[in-house]
Amino acid sequence: MSHFFAHLSRLKLINRWPLMRNVRTENVSEHSLQVAFVAHALAIIKNRKFSGNVNAERIALLAMYHDASEVITGDLPTPIKYHNPHIAREYKKIEKIAQKKLLEMLPAELQEDFRPILDDSQHTEEEISIVKQADALCAYLKCLEELSAGNSEFNLAKARLEKTLAARHSQEMDYFMTVFVPGFSLSLDEISLDIPD
């Protein structure tokens, strides 16, 4: 018997942004799906507009599982995780152990199929970069949504994420920011005005 998917189903019980007041609580499961949507879009944009040659479906899959180890480690708040290089290094080691534990939960005959997804040492630098861009973008979008709902608690997080996005800058991210991000600050009525008949 394998408890792999029973564990993954518990990602919905792990709340993100645990130290901050949230107008709407976000869990790791829904965050992972949004990161998969955005990473897939970034990969397609890269391929179509900027002469990229990445596997958009694989990148979406990597993004879907990018926080899977948190079902074992929990979600450590970013300011703590990156407080200093020593903590960041040690937490990375903990994530590797959690990835290995997750993989070992699978039946032996399935482990080699999941290893390239769960073991981030088997991801290319380009794949990692796109998933990290999508992850940061989704955190930024969460800040915009919270700020639009009147929650000033996310002001500093938004400023920090703007720096992160600038550091991870890419043409596909610029395109996504220009074309898709403005809608996240609008109301349902405002975004519904553009729906074709």
UniProtKB/Swiss-Prot annotation:
Places the protein is found: Cytoplasm
Entry keyword set: Cytoplasm, Hydrolase, Metal-binding, Nucleotide-binding
Leader sequence segment: none
Site (Appears to be important in orienting the phosphate for catalysis): 16
Cofactor: a divalent metal cation
Reaction catalysis annotation: a 2'-deoxyribonucleoside 5'-phosphate + H2O = a 2'-deoxyribonucleoside + phosphate
Binding site for a divalent metal cation: 31, 66-67, 135
GO MF, one example: nucleotide binding
Cited Pfam families: YfbR-like
Function in brief: Catalyzes the strictly specific dephosphorylation of 2'-deoxyribonucleoside 5'-monophosphates.
Family the entry assigns: Belongs to the 5DNU family.
Protein name: 5'-deoxynucleotidase yfbR
Source species of the chain: Photorhabdus temperata
